């Protein structure tokens, strides 16, 4: 089987059998069976996910990461390899990321067997990127303590860039992702005696209005930030004063100072609800992923490796505003660099975005990814 047949076979198998974050048991077994077939040793620090290692001839150790989880989305692609799991789909391309790393493992094993593997390589098949912070979990579990990793590399398919294009950016390339929730508690009464109640309905309207004004009045308009309201609710019946209210959303920013401003404003909003409406209001934050920071020291190696892989490099002027837990590797483990690989092909209908029910791409783009990985390995220099 040639390499294109390899990536097509394995990617489509994984696409048919997607699993949600922290439940990637079959996917993990599939990866382990593949590694076993190559006689490669590996560790499983968590219930799902795999860390493999190959010793090379050099003194440097570098790591490559692929995320392996899927999303709770009903696939609508009419293809033979459509998801066989109800309402679970590889709608973010992690099946491709995993497959590319599998083939790269095989290439590295062939090099090792020939005595030509230039450096030590750690292969990270990471669980729970979507909703579990799998990268942080692995680091906290000590998964990398025995490896003197000097750099971590990763990619993500990008349906907004054409095939043959690699999108890069030094410093911030993805935003932080922080969830927030407002909890309101008032006093119910019949609508005929509404003056005896403390309405969470009007209080929630106030919260909505104030949140929508944070971006306009408190953040620098030249920076890209998102303060998004995703869901809200007040009350249970049409003829009673609402005694409870709830609102939740997400904050996306690549500047820690801006995130602090948003949080401070939300705390002030919660305090104002008590004063204005006599309604208790609490805001809670679920810390998500920090911004992904690409080390400028790795830029030259990245760009050279991409060009040698026949990819055209596009330097993105601003970060993406979605979150990515690859950020934890650069924050806690070693200098890191994350690249987006274009998969858009209008002739083949591969045009829909990430996290959509029609996401798909041509497996041939994965060969470019593997060539990029190998170029990095062959020409790696410590930074």
Curated annotation (Swiss-Prot):
Q: List the disulfide bonds.
A: none
Which Enzyme Commission numbers does its entry carry? 3.-.-.-
Q: Which SUPFAM superfamilies match?
A: Bacterial exopeptidase dimerisation domain, Zn-dependent exopeptidases
Question: Sorted alphabetically, which keywords does the UniProt record give?
Answer: Hydrolase
What Pfam family is a match for this entry?
M20_dimer
Gene Ontology MF terms in the entry: hydrolase activity
Q: Which NCBIfam families match?
A: amidohydrolases
Q: Which PANTHER family match?
A: METALLOPEPTIDASE, PUTATIVE (AFU_ORTHOLOGUE AFUA_6G09600)-RELATED, PEPTIDASE M20 FAMILY MEMBER
| Family, as annotated | Belongs to the peptidase M20 family.
Please give the name of this protein: Uncharacterized hydrolase SACOL1433
Organism of provenance: Staphylococcus aureus (strain COL)
Mind giving the lineage of the organism this protein is from?
Answer: Bacteria, Bacillati, Bacillota, Bacilli, Bacillales
């Amino acid at each position: 089987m040639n390499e294109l047949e390899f990536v097509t076979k394995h990617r489509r198998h994984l696409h048919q059998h997607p699993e949600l974050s922290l439940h990637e048991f079959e996917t993990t077994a599939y990866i382990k069976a593949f590694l076993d077939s190559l006689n490669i040793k590996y560790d499983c620090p968590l219930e799902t996910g795999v860390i493999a290692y190959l010793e090379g001839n050099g003194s440097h150790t570098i790591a490559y990461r692929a995320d392996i989880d899927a999303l709770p989305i009903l696939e609508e692609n009419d293809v033979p390899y459509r998801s066989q799991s109800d309402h679970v789909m590889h709608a973010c391309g992690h099946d491709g990321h995993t497959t590319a790393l599998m083939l790269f493992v095989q290439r590295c094993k062939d090099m090792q067997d020939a005595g030509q593997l230039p450096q030590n390589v750690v292969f990270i098949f990471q669980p729970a990127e979507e909703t579990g912070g799998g990268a942080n979990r692995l680091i906290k579990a000590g998964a990398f303590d025995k490896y003197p990793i000097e750099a971590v590399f990763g990619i993500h398919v990008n349906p907004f860039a054409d095939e043959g294009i690699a999108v890069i950016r030094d410093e911030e390339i993805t935003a932080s992702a922080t969830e927030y929730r407002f909890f309101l508690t008032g006093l119910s009464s019949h609508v005929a005696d509404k003056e005896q109640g403390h309405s969470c309905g009007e209080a929630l309207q106030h919260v909505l209005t104030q949140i929508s004004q944070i971006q306009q009045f408190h953040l620098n308009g030249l920076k890209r930030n998102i303060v998004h309201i995703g869901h809200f609710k007040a009350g249970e019946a049409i003829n009673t004063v609402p005694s409870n209210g709830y609102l939740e959303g997400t904050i996306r920013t690549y500047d820690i100072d801006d995130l602090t401003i948003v949080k401070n404003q939300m705390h002030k909003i919660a305090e104002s609800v008590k004063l204005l409406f006599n309604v208790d209001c609490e805001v809670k934050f679920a810390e998500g992923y920090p911004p992904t920071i690409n080390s400028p020291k790795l830029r030259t190696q990245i760009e050279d490796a991409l060009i040698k892989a026949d990819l055209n490099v596009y330097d993105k002027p601003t970060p993406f505003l979605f979150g990515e837990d690859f950020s934890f590797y650069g924050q806690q483990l070693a200098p890191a660099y994350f690249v987006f690989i274009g998969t858009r092909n209008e002739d083949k209908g591969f045009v829909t975005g990430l996290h959509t029910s029609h996401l798909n791409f041509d497996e041939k783009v994965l060969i470019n990814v593997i060539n990029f990985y190998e170029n990095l390995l062959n020409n790696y220099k410590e930074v």
